[in-house]
């Protein structure tokens, strides 16, 4: 609520505008990460609007800090910025990576907050990877990249803890129930209109 008031009532900014700015910063960071992993290129800050450069640079630097740590292990990139689609939903995964022989599904976030909703998203991708690509995921995680200084937080859950696997299974069932609910509501509305509206 405080954040909404700060960008809305007191700062005279529209909520939608604030979301677009945040999304734009995240897009610059994601594009930089993609180019670095695929081609070894560093982020070109000259392509980033001046008002975004500081936060984008910190977030990208936070990624590089994470990458330096993870690169000390046996790492193989399987997919990056890859579109995943099934008949009912889809999205774009950030990174599917093998670390020491175990497959992890990772999502990079530049937002200031964390949410269980990130794991609903990962559960949806995990579902598609399992049933449409025959890829078994060992672990899922959110890598939160700081925009104020160089630093990152990892929110990783994997099969080494049974309660973590249980959590991901609940996330998958929850996400699928939302999808099924939407589909069924659409069918109810369509059938109602066919029967009563004509």
Which positions does each model-derived feature cover?
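Metal-dependent nuclease catalytic cores that hydrolyze phosphodiester bonds in DNA/RNA
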Residues: 1-90
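Conserved catalytic cores of phosphodiester-cleaving nucleases, focusing on short active-site segments
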Residues: 29-30, 91-112, 125
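Hydrophobic/aromatic-lined pockets within catalytic cores
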Residues: 37, 41, 113, 127-131
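A structural signal for short, well-ordered beta-strand segments
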Residues: 80, 95, 140-141
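A generic structural motif
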Residues: 85, 98, 143-145
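Active-site-adjacent loop/helix micro-motif of nuclease/hydrolase catalytic cores
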Residues: 113-120
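Short, charged, amphipathic alpha-helix that recurs within catalytic cores of restriction-modification
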Residues: 120-128
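Metal-dependent nuclease catalytic regions and adjoining charged, substrate-binding loops involved
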Residues: 128-198
